[in-house]
């Protein structure tokens, strides 16, 4: 246990958002790698970062593992939407994106349920939980890479940064959504642990 205070939590989240702020650099990576390959590599980074977190219970160690997993997470999030839209036609995209969001929510419920059961009933250690989570991510990434090494695209891929004034509302909502996520999932969680003594299983049950 690293025994973080609010100051360390703030620094940790600042480090976590550095790759998010620099996610636009994905357009330069795509000049070298195919988008699908980039997505697989990003997921591998995410899995490795999660897997090693439990074995680095220090301030510097958690900063390092958080940065690694954040690089994977933010780059994957950057290309995920693009890959999803390339698979579908314009007519079927809204319904299919809704199904993808539903699948993502279902996966979150499975993960939170696993945390709750692992801490309350199984008694797994932090390092074991992180190792299991990271290993599952790596195994699924390897499976997807072997099962789908290359797939076609219904929509031509653009490899340049695109910003348009008429999308300002979308940009604003995305910005506010990020702010909400920081407040709700980061500092609210820290408050529940620090001030109200919530355990890991309590936080997991709350998210469920």
Residue ranges and their predicted role:
Residues 44-57:
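C-terminal ends and interior cores of transmembrane alpha-helices
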Residues 2, 24-32, 109-130, 190, ...:
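Transmembrane alpha-helix termini and helix-breaking/packing motifs in multi-pass membrane transporters
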Residues 49-50, 60-76:
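Hydrophobic core of transmembrane alpha-helices in multi-pass small-molecule transporters
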Residues 147-179:
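Juxtamembrane intracellular "pre-TM" segments in multi-pass secondary transporters
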Residues 115-116, 134-153:
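C-terminal membrane-cytosol helix-exit motif in multi-pass small-molecule transporters
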Residues 75-88:
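Intracellular juxtamembrane helix-capping segments at the cytosolic ends
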Residues 1-8, 186-203:
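Short amphipathic helix-loop junctions that connect adjacent transmembrane helices
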Residues 95-113:
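Glycine-rich segments within core transmembrane alpha-helices of 12-TM secondary carriers
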